Structure formats: structure tokens, C-alpha cells
């Protein structure tokens, strides 16, 4: 692992979110760098972070780059974590603000930008996935556009894309990830879910492991990484059935029989309960293998894994194990 080089000033957006809080914590603990946090509500910054003499907090709407760019000072590295999840805000934050901040670094001598995309916009080989642009939600389409535009700036500044898969994380004072919230919500229904099996394959990753990789890439030489630098973050792929079995084993459940939820049965359930599917939902139903040929975790960079298995992640988000 490279030792942190000269002290840097690092801009972080989205610092009060799930991944953002782990990232700030990681950088303060493992590097000498100073952090500039652009946050709308400084009250959401943990007190120990806000009181650190290495942290500068700028109260601002991240999408209003013109309104705060003159207060940024020298920025060596930007970690663009903030996300707009839907509506016009998705494009204002995910595209416009991220590109404006990248351009600001280019004009003012910045060295590196790490932006956050999503695994949904690339295929198993890391190529851009056209259906994501055509069928995706506003969030997914905006992330697709971000990748297209920000990679054009790679000749002027180091550009590294981080593409998390399903994110576990939260608890102990940190905001829950969407996936963690979903698992907590389905926990009371595990007695029913235990009887079903389904096709599919995917990755998951803990937010702290995302933070470790991002922290490493702040200082590491980038030559070993293939271009374009699209770093898919995840544990080894698991099938849907393996995930269900691990979840049930953690809860101490062992079903006496199982029913495979094939596409015809799924369609019947959708019609019975009048479930509304978006074009992207329908696409994902038809393309259930969401695994990638090359994924990265802290172990790939010589760092310890925080969450090497599902049981560790479930315990951390507060799902009690059944004794």
C-alpha cells in the first residue's frame, strides 16, 4: 500500500450520506490530508469530524457550484460522492455539479477526480450499457451521462470512476444504505421468503470497503489500472439462491421445501397484485445476471476487508442473529 504522499486538500461532496461518512472517517484515520466538505446541513456532520482541525465545512447546495467555488481554495483531489436520486435534481447533481467541479479542478491545478457512478450503467465487461441510457431511471440515466462526459476530461486530469454494486452499510450513528434498509424491511417476512428460490447473480459491497478503496486511490499511482478507469466495487458474485441461503442461515431458518420463482410465476404474481414495473424493472427481470468479470475490493490493493461475508454485514446493520 502506498504511504500517503504530500499532505493534500481533498474536496468531498455527499459527506453526510452513508458512503460519505465512512469515507471521511477513513481519510481522517489513515491519511494526513485535510478535508473540505460541501454540505447543505452542517448539523449532520458528526461532532468529532466537525471539530477536527483537518476539516473545513462549507455550507452550500452542492449543485450551486458557482455560489461556493471561490471558497474552495486549492483542491488537489475531489471525491464526488453526492447523488441526486430522482427528478431534475438527479441531473443537476449527478451531471452538472460533478462536471463543474471537475472543470474547476482542471482550471486550478487539481490532480485527480474520483467520481461515483453505479454498476447499473456498465455491462459485465465494463462497457457502457446502452439500455441503461434508454430505459433507466432518472438516477441511472444521469449517471450514464456523467460517465460519458467526465471521461472526456481524462486528458486534462486523472479521472477514476467508482462503480459500487449493492451497498451494505450504516448503523452505529451512520445513515443506512438503501440496500441495508431493504434487508431490514424484509427481515420480518423471512419466514415467507425462505420457501422461494430465484435465478440471478449479483455482487454486494460494504460502504467501509468502498471507503478503503477510495482512500487508497487518492494517493496510489494509477498506471496499473486499465483505461478507462472504471472500478467496479464488490465482493465475489453470489447467486440469488446463495444469498437467500446465507440470509436464512444467519437467521437460523431452514425451509422444509422451496419453490423456484420462475419468470412465468413472477409474471402471475405481478398481474395478481397489479405491480407496476418500469421499463428498467422489466429489463432487469429479463437480464438477471448482474455480475461483472472484474470487481475490486480492498484485498486487491493489499488492504484488509471489513466485510468479507454477508453475516458480518447483517450484524453491523442491526439484524439480530437467531440463536
Each predicted region: which residue ranges?
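Substrate-binding strand-loop-helix patch
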Residues: 201-208, 229-250, 263-268, 308
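A conserved pocket-lining segment of Rossmann-fold NAD(P)-dependent short-chain dehydrogenase/reductase
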Residues: 184-205, 216
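Conserved Rossmann-fold NAD(P)-dependent oxidoreductase catalytic core, especially the SDR/UDP-sugar
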Residues: 98-142
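Conserved beta-loop-beta element that borders a ligand/cofactor-binding pocket
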Residues: 149-174
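N-terminal Rossmann NAD(P)H-binding glycine-rich loop of SDR-like oxidoreductase domains
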Residues: 8-33
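NAD(P)H-binding glycine-rich loop region in Rossmannoid oxidoreductase-like domains
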Residues: 51-100, 104, 124-127
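Terminal hydrophobic/aromatic helix or amphipathic segment near a protein terminus
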Residues: 244-293
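Amphipathic terminal alpha-helices
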Residues: 291-323
